[in-house]
Amino acid sequence: MFRGSITALVTPFRQDGSLDKKAFGALVEWQIAEGSSGLVPVGTTGESPTLTHDEHQEVIRLCVEAANKRVPVIAGAGSNSTREAISFAEHAEKVGADALLVVTPYYNKPNQRGLYEHFAAIARSTSLPIFIYNIPPRSVVDMLPETMARLAADFKNIVGVKDATAKLDRVSEQREACGPDFIQLSGEDATALGFNAHGGVGCISVTANVAPRLCAEFQAASLRGDGARAIELQDRLFPLHKALFLEPNPAGAKYALSRLGRLENVLRSPLVTVEASTAEKIDAAMKHAGLLN
């Protein structure tokens, strides 16, 4: 159920900064039509830090409603407050999400015992499958494989990880610690091919916002063992993977989607739109991938 190209959705805004619900619904429809195998609303790429609680919950509800069980919705439910994360988890379950993506607490820097207790409390609060989101560059904490293994052993609904460490050996370490059934999804587009080779089964992808069909085809080729096709698609996508992250995410993805006419190029402060020089590089990468003429 949770494998392949799973899109970490952007949250579209109007020029006045309000949620663009129409554009969001259309984005969900396009993603499903293009072959994405899952959707993640309100993660890092969804600008969760600048959404109000009501907006956070509304975006998840809209995504669940638009997806209508055609693909799984893994709702962003992370916070550096355990109580707040539990509240997000309970709401996501209530509105019909299929799973939760819970980031390791950021800024307050809990130790491994604190990480265990945080995820244990969330797991006790919901019956939904939980994916640990381990992203040390943003959270400044790194959940170690041993801690992950304890959680997976103690809670049946802690089923996998979105790994954004970009350490390919970590996939094998987590497979050894947590077992082969623990679902490992890459959180880093550029290294997703190597991630799968180590035992991963997909990617929660930023690039899939912009190139959903190519990303879906890439993941399908990789997972069926068609290395030649996977590398061919990797070569088409790699410049785009790089260009979209020249400035803080999701500025690159939103610019690219605006070039495709999918949404307004609007972010919420303190994030800002990409510089002109970056826009040129994204345009070139989109042309290389065959997304622009």
From Swiss-Prot:
Residue numbers binding pyruvate: 45, 204
Site label Part of a proton relay during catalysis, positions: 44, 107
Positions annotated as active site in the UniProt record: 133, 162
Tree of life domain: Bacteria
Pfam families named in the record: DHDPS (PF00701)
PROSITE patterns (UniProt xref): DHDPS_1 (PS00665), DHDPS_2 (PS00666)
Main localization of the protein described in the UniProt heading: cytoplasm
EC main group: lyase
Subcellular location: Cytoplasm
Family the UniProt entry places it in: Belongs to the DapA family.
HAMAP family given in the database record: DapA (MF_00418)
Assembly with partners or alone: Homotetramer; dimer of dimers.
Name used for this protein in its record: 4-hydroxy-tetrahydrodipicolinate synthase
Organism: Chelativorans sp. (strain BNC1)
Lineage, uppermost ranks: Bacteria, Pseudomonadati, Pseudomonadota, Alphaproteobacteria, Hyphomicrobiales
